[in-house]
Amino acid sequence: MIRPIKKITLRKTKKKSPKGVIHIQASFNNTIVTITDLRGQVISWSSSGACGFKGAKKSTAYAAQIATENAIKQWTDQNTKQAEVMMSGPGPGRETALRAIRNSRVILSFIRDVTPIPHNGCRPPKKRRV
């Protein structure tokens, strides 16, 4: 008699890392907050657009604050409270996002600005003649 073959599946278990990295990307149009573990695996994320803000309201400081609070709320459910912060971009939500992190009682080990700066980069467009 033939026995049915049992399906062997691997269950993925999320490892709770003691520390996380909060990446804040603040552009002039939107603010994206991504929280990863130390290896770079995404744990939670949020953005101004994902929080329900549309159009010009996405680029406000208040939208960045709400996006940061949402991402941290998902992350702290896993009982992780220590983080590093990497900020990039010149947007208006940059300082507000950092203020929201400080208000959430997350222990910060360091804050680093990782905005890319060109070493004389691309040639600018020609001057406009009107």
From Swiss-Prot:
Its main location: plastid. InterPro entries: Ribosomal_uS11 (IPR001971), Ribosomal_uS11_bac-type (IPR019981), Ribosomal_uS11_sf (IPR036967). One of its GO terms (biological process) is translation. GO terms for molecular function: rRNA binding; structural constituent of ribosome. Keywords: Chloroplast, Plastid, Ribonucleoprotein, Ribosomal protein, RNA-binding, rRNA-binding. It is found in: Plastid, Chloroplast. It comes from the Eukaryota. GO terms for cellular component: chloroplast; ribonucleoprotein complex; ribosome. Part of the 30S ribosomal subunit. Belongs to the universal ribosomal protein uS11 family. HAMAP family: Ribosomal_uS11. PANTHER family: 40S RIBOSOMAL PROTEIN S14/30S RIBOSOMAL PROTEIN S11. NCBIfam families: PRK05309.1 (NF003698), uS11_bact (TIGR03632). This is Small ribosomal subunit protein uS11c. It comes from Chara vulgaris (Common stonewort).
